[in-house]
Each structure stands twice: as C-alpha cells, then as structure tokens.
A protein has these predicted regions:
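PP2C/PPM-type serine/threonine phosphatase catalytic domain
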Residues: 1-339
Length: 339
C-alpha cells in the first residue's frame, strides 16, 4: 500500500571538526515516481564528495534505465545496475584524482543513497552512513556499517574480505589508515598501492618481507555497494538518512524515539531534524553531522506533550540538552554557509 508523499527535513553541521567534509543531495521530480536522496561523508578533503555530487546521481539514473528498474521486482537486475553505477563512477573519480593537486589527491568518501517511492525504498551504500526506518516506533536498519572492526556480522565479513584481497587490518583500520572498508576515491589504497607500500617501507612502517606478501591484484578497498530494497507499508512513519556523526552519538532506536517525540510535540520535521542534530552534539559528537529525514505524516501530534513521561532514559537525556544546544546548531549552520 502506498504511503503519502513525504515532507523532508535536512541539516548539515560542521560540529567541532576543523573542516566540513560532509554533504547531502535531494533530487525531487527528476525520476518518475521516486525521490533521490544521498549523504556523502568525505575524508582527507572534500574533493571526492564534490565529484560524487556531480556524477553519482546521473550515473545511477542511467544504469537504472531512467528509473524503470526501480519499478521492477527483479532484485538481481537492480543490484547489478547500482553496483555498475558505483564502480564506474569510482573508476572515473580515481582518474580525476590523479590529475589533482597533491592536497586533494588522497581524498575519499562514503556514499549512502536512497530512491524513495510511494511503495518502496531502494538503498545503495558504501561506508558507514546509515538509513533507518521507523515502523510503528520500531527502528529498522536498512544498511550495515562497512567498518573493519567490531564483532558484528558485517564487520567480521568486511575484515575477512580485505585480508582475502591481500590487504590487512591494523588498529581497526584498513591498512592502518581508513576506518571504513568500502569507499569512493582513496587512490593510495587502490591505484597507488605499490607507491604507498614503498613509502611505508622508507618510513620503516613495515618490512620488505611484509611488502612481498601483499597481493596487489585484489580490491583492498572497494566502491561496490550493498543494495537493499524494502516495502514501505502503512507502518512506515519516517526514514532517517544520516552520516556517522549522528550514529556514533545516538543509537538507531533512540534516534527513532527522539524524532517521534519531536513530531508528537510540534509536528515539524525540520525542527525535529535540527533537534536531532543538537542531540548528537549534546552526546559529545566529534564529527560532521548530516541528517535528512523523510516524514510520511503518520506520527500524530499530541497536545500537552511536555508532561508526557513514556520516554526512555536515553531519549529523555537528549531531549533535555538538545533544546539548549539549538542556538549552537543554528550558529554552526550559519558559519558553514559563510565558509
């Protein structure tokens, strides 16, 4: 059953970081029956993020045959098309990075994109930005973080994949360098691995024996995405798409509960988005934060919610502090616009 056309709230904050390396994209009306949304979380500069904003949407649409494959129930074709789009854009990005100044050449980025229709949502992602649906107040994660550390099923599988391809995991990072196991760009872990190993040898970071055991034919770091399609249904209340700056501070279930309380209180999805960002900062958030929320209008406003007590302890804590920090959120947002 179809859901109502969503209202969107979105906010990007630099937070305490010296640079803003996050960005997001929202394209409405450019694909029949679907809206495109994306969050890009860059590292070692913003150049890869800027490239993805220019190239990834159009490449995905072309691979999806103008959006026709989004209407199909053939998950194999859908996954193949989006995987092709991601990999092709990454190949072009690597060639482009080779031509850039040294300060921009080493950049990379995660990418989490979703195609939101009336009856289903399709998500493709590399990295650790996350998509979460609220279904009747229950959090359903549509993505699994591509990180090479931790005990989750995905983390263990990603670590094994990197090692099987000839790379290694050190201090929870791919080759001791990158905290995500899938990403766009990062030429030192792709097309310039030989040069990276030679440089490390000069700096005594590893031995010649260690270098000789590295397999340079496999993909240590890949831009091939995981692709998920989910039916929305009448229990779908809203969808949160956000960078790890949110999820490292607030659990998925608490983010869903927080947004529901906000919508019950005032019904404004933009205010809810801003308050959620403030809540992440209140939880000692140390990263850039980008949040986009699609609200299907299912959470009814409740008068007199200030006296509402049926909230978890974690959500109560962020509710108390987020209001105080909203002025800081606005100030940070304005500062990022000026920059």
């Amino acid at each position: 059953m179809a859901v109502a056309a969503p209202l969107f709230g979105k906010l990007a904050l630099q937070g305490p970081r010296a640079e803003m390396e996050d960005d997001m994209e929202l394209e409405e009306g450019r694909i029949p029956e679907f809206t495109f949304a994306a969050v890009y979380d860059g590292h070692a500069g913003i150049s890869s993020v800027n490239y993805l904003k220019k190239e990834l949407f159009s490449e995905c649409v072309n691979a999806l045959q103008g959006g026709a494959l989004l209407q199909s129930d053939n998950s194999i074709d859908l996954e193949a098309a989006l995987s092709q789009a991601f990999v092709q854009v990454d190949k072009r990005l690597l060639s482009w990075l080779e031509q850039q100044e040294e300060s921009d050449r080493e950049s990379g980025s995660t990418a989490t994109v979703m195609f939101l229709g009336k009856e289903k949502v399709v998500v493709a992602h590399v990295g650790d930005s996350r998509v979460v649906i609220s279904r009747g107040g229950k959090a359903e994660e549509l993505t699994s973080d591509h990180r090479p550390y931790g005990s989750s099923k995905t983390a263990l599988a990603e670590g094994k994949r990197v090692i099987a391809a000839g790379g290694w995991i050190s201090n929870g990072r791919v080759c001791g360098n990158l905290a995500v196991s899938r990403a766009f760009g990062d030429i030192s872990l792709k097309s310039r691995r030989k040069e990276m190993l030679e440089e490390g040898l000069k700096k005594n970071l590893w031995t010649q024996k260690f270098v000789s055991k590295r397999d340079l034919t496999g993909e240590w770091l890949t831009a091939a995405p995981d692709v998920t399609a989910a039916t929305l249904g009448q229990d779908a209340e809203f969808i949160i798409l956000a960078s790890d700056g949110l999820w490292d501070s607030i659990k998925s279930k608490d983010a869903v509960a927080f947004v529901r309380e906000q919508l019950k209180e005032h019904g404004d999805i933009q205010r809810a988005c801003e308050s959620l960002a403030a809540a992440a900062l209140a939880q000692n958030g140390q990263d850039n934060i980008s949040i986009l929320i699609a609200d299907f209008g299912k959470v009814a406003r409740v008068d007199g919610l200030a006296q509402h007590q049926d909230v978890s302890a974690g959500v109560k804590q962020v509710l108390v502090t987020s209001g105080i920090l909203l002025l800081g959120v606005y100030a940070s947002h304005l500062a990022s616009l000026i920059r």
